[in-house]
């Protein structure tokens, strides 16, 4: 299916690995010129070369920056003053007890997971409205609506993104600009795969068997009993960026493998 995104420009934050990289790849597959973001210049450059080799008709660019830093954010704006698509994927997480989350941790998570995304959106949204086309996607989590209690500082920020997206969507009334949120469930990132391999390092099992054993022991509520693959989220994001998804406005879209047991 042609998503009709050829020659659009997209900034995908945190796009050198995991979900962000998968989204960047799937957008490039649709002919989008992707700005690859990360703090490590070598990783950014490597990802740009990888995408360029896979999709030679696109022009991926390096957007190396720590987007929590206002100065680096402003430098990025000067270099890339307009994008058609903004995917606010960058974020941090760590399992922590409530007792260990001090004010400094709260502040770090708020600045990284919320304020950076808000700052990018505040800069790029006016141009999208002026051109009567734009897509903003915030990456949240099923933890936004079903907090596990294992990382309250993370869950809070992801819930805030749902509210932010819904609020900002009101500004797009009558335009072809959309602002939505994707809530992925447990996803097979490089780090997750490494953890699973380590847990079952002494077992004579295929990775698929290790994955099923881990899910049964730790995430029995998952209805798919496997980790979501980043490419699945990438394809969903590409669709949401397309003209075919113009009726999604302020929507929190769950791709959680059935983790959340409620209808809403």
Write out the residue ranges for each language-model feature.
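Short C-terminal tail/terminal secondary-structure segment
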Residues: 6, 146, 238, 249-264
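Conserved glycine-rich cofactor-binding loop
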Residues: 9, 16-17
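Active-site helix of classical SDR
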Residues: 121, 157, 165
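Alpha-helical segment proximal to the catalytic Tyr-Lys
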Residues: 126, 170-171, 246
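Residue(s) in the substrate-gating loop at a strand-loop-helix junction
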Residues: 141
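Short, small/polar-rich loop/turn modules that mediate ligand/substrate recognition or access, typified
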Residues: 173, 178, 248-250
């Amino acid at each position: 299916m042609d998503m009709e995104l050829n020659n659009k420009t997209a900034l995908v934050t945190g796009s050198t690995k995991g979900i962000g990289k998968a989204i960047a790849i799937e957008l490039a597959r649709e002919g989008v010129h992707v700005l690859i973001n990360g703090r490590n210049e070598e990783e950014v450059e490597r990802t740009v070369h990888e995408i360029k080799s896979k999709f030679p008709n696109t022009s991926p660019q390096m957007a190396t920056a720590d987007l929590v830093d206002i100065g680096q954010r402003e430098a990025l704006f000067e270099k890339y003053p307009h994008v058609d698509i903004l995917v606010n994927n960058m974020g941090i997480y760590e399992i922590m007890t409530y007792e260990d989350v001090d004010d400094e941790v709260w502040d770090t998570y708020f600045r990284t997971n919320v304020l950076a995304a808000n700052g990018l959106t505040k800069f790029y949204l006016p141009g999208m409205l002026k051109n009567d086309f734009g897509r903003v996607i915030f990456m949240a989590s099923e933890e936004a609506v079903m907090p596990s209690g294992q990382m309250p500082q993370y869950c809070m920020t992801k819930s805030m993104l749902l509210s932010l997206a819904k609020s900002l969507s009101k500004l797009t009334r009558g335009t072809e600009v959309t602002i939505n949120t994707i809530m992925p469930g447990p996803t097979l990132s490089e780090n997750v795969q490494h953890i699973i391999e380590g847990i079952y390092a002494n077992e004579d099992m295929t990775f698929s068997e290790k994955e099923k054993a881990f899910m049964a022991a730790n995430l029995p509520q998952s209805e798919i009993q496997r980790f979501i693959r980043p490419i699945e989220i990438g394809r969903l994001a590409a669709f949401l960026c397309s003209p075919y998804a113009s009726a999604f406005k302020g929507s929190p879209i769950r791709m959680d493998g059935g983790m959340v047991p409620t209808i809403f």
